Amino acid sequence: PFTTTELLRMTRDFGFALYDPQRLRLYDPRDHIDVDVELGDGTQVPYLSERLLAGLFDRPDPRWPWLIVRRAEHHYIQSIFMEGRAVVIEHRRRGPDQHFSATTSDRQLAQRILWNWATQTPGWEECLSWQRVEIGADT
């Protein structure tokens, strides 16, 4: 049997979408970018598209309401969906001394920030007021 990640890689490579009926989610690789995405339930997705990101924002998993988009071990952006409409966004460059957080109740803005970060579109940081996150040495 194949893992979800293996199936997502295969369907991406052939240009096919994959529907997960348990999570009511369509993984559509059209117009994707190659980044690593980790969903709150542990699902590893080897790409991101605007359609997939929109679906993740429209229907976050209520049990594990977050996602991480990663370029490298200490270079990522993540969102945590709070009750109501609020979204906490955190991003890190290089290490714990470069970890920042912001909160918005505008989910479309949060989605746009994650997409612009993932596509390296300039200006995404100016959309919110970021606060440095103090993280202990063991993190």
Regions found by a protein language model. Give the residues of each.
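Acidic, proline/glycine-rich low-complexity IDRs
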Residues: 2-139
